């Protein structure tokens, strides 16, 4: 078998890179979160979406600068290690891996909910369908089948099409009365909706592997990120507004897209939504597990892929059985299930933003500081789930044994004098270790 790990990938145009970036940002969580936010905050959930879009813009700006400075050899763990040290980088890697593992059952539950809606069945059917989807994905993963980027882009295009059809087709049924009361549970409900919604914005770190495929990263990358931000912002806001304005009292359900499509095109709406949700769930979960397997192998010091696959599958199976079983028994809610991977990803982003404060300079450093503070507040607002994330980070950080020969440079950035500017500027901290090079997009 030929080793193609070091083969040079084809160069990307700005449009092609933007398409891949949008594919990394959009996922099955878009099918659930508008309804979840509306349930917690009512029409005021739109304000939460707006606020988090501003935050995601700051995060995108920071990752753009990190991507152009640190290059494709680094990922979220590499950025954290470069600014905060190798132990922090190791903790970030494990938090990200744990986020993918705990996010897998949530993604499958999204697909299961749309199947249950199609069948007109209750919540238990959704959990059974989620387990069936998960078993299928794990079997495929053990078989070694990967989800190609081409298929991912096709499925994302299908998702975008469904959202556009749903929003545009259902728009005539919007009612002003559905916007009152604007905040039925007060600002407490708005605050509760904020942390889970961050799951929709996981993916900005995917800028790392794209930089190596751009002809001129410093010129192209800002355009790529700007395009991706504009497209995703329109989709998120459009779906959030339509969910509230059209569905009204039914906005808080687990399948908002099915409800909008039913209004837009009639009885075939839930069928299209279910088919799209199941296909996206299977492909996205397989892609997440593929990336998680690679990261697990790297964290294990380069252990065999087969061993890493078996370990990842076992971890996902055990975690999913625990979480879905607890949800099916009524011990936890869907919102609480979403809170676990969200808290883990928030911890990763907190580390990246804190590292960026040390590594970068100028306005981007200020953006990183603001983003770091807001992410910290969101993490604190996630409640008990933050304790789960903190435990993972603490154990990973204290048990890590950094290799002295690793290429991670954990020092603060060196400074180089710029005669034209009359000041010193940070120097690229250099590439990170291979462990940090793994990049996995979240749900």
Describe every region a protein language model picked out.
Residues 3-7, 46, 50, 124, ...:
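Helix-loop-helix junctions that connect adjacent transmembrane segments
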Residues 341, 354-443:
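A generic transmembrane alpha-helix motif of multi-pass inner-membrane proteins
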């Amino acid at each position: 078998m030929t080793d193609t790990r070091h083969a040079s990938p084809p160069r990307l145009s700005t449009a092609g890179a933007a398409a891949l970036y949008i594919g990394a940002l959009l996922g099955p969580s878009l099918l659930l979160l508008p309804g979840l936010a509306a349930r917690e905050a009512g029409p005021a959930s739109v304000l939460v979406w707006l606020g988090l879009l501003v935050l995601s813009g700051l995060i995108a700006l920071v990752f753009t600068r990190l991507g152009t400075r640190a290059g494709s050899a680094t990922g979220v763990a590499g950025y954290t290690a470069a600014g905060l040290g190798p132990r922090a980088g190791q903790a970030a890697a494990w938090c990200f891996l744990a986020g993918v593992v705990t996010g897998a059952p949530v993604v499958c539950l999204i697909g299961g909910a749309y199947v249950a809606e199609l069948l007109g069945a209750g919540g238990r059917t959704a959990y059974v369908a989620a387990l069936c989807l998960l078993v299928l994905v794990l079997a495929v993963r053990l078989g070694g089948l990967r989800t190609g980027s081409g298929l991912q882009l096709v499925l994302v295009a299908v998702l975008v099409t469904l959202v556009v059809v749903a929003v545009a087709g259902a728009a005539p049924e919007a009612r002003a009365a559905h916007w009152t009361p604007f905040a039925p549970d007060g600002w407490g409900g708005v605050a509760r909706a904020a942390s889970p919604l961050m799951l929709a914005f996981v993916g900005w770190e995917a800028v790392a592997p794209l930089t190596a495929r751009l002809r001129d990263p410093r010129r192209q990358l800002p355009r790529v990120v700007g395009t991706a931000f504009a497209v995703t912002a329109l989709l998120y806001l459009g779906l959030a507004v339509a969910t509230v304005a059209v569905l009204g009292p039914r906005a808080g359900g687990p399948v908002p897209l099915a409800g909008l499509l039913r209004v837009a095109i009639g009885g075939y709406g839930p069928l299209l939504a279910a088919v799209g949700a199941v296909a996206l769930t299977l492909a996205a979960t397989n892609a997440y597990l593929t990336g998680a397997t690679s990261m697990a192998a790297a964290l294990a010091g380069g252990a065999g892929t087969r061993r890493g696959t078996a370990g990842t599958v076992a971890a996902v199976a055990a975690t999913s059985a625990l979480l879905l079983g607890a949800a099916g028994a009524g011990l936890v809610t869907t919102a609480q299930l979403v809170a676990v991977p969200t808290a883990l990803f928030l911890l990763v982003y907190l580390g990246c933003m804190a590292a960026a404060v040390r590594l970068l300079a100028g306005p981007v450093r200020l953006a990183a500081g603001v983003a770091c503070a807001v992410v910290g507040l969101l993490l604190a607002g996630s409640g008990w789930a933050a304790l789960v994330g903190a435990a993972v980070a603490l154990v990973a950080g204290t048990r890590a044994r950094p290799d002295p020969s690793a290429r991670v440079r954990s020092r603060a950035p060196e400074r180089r004098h710029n005669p034209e500017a009359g000041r010193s500027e940070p120097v690229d901290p250099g590439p990170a270790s291979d462990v940090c090079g793994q990049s996995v997009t979240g749900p």
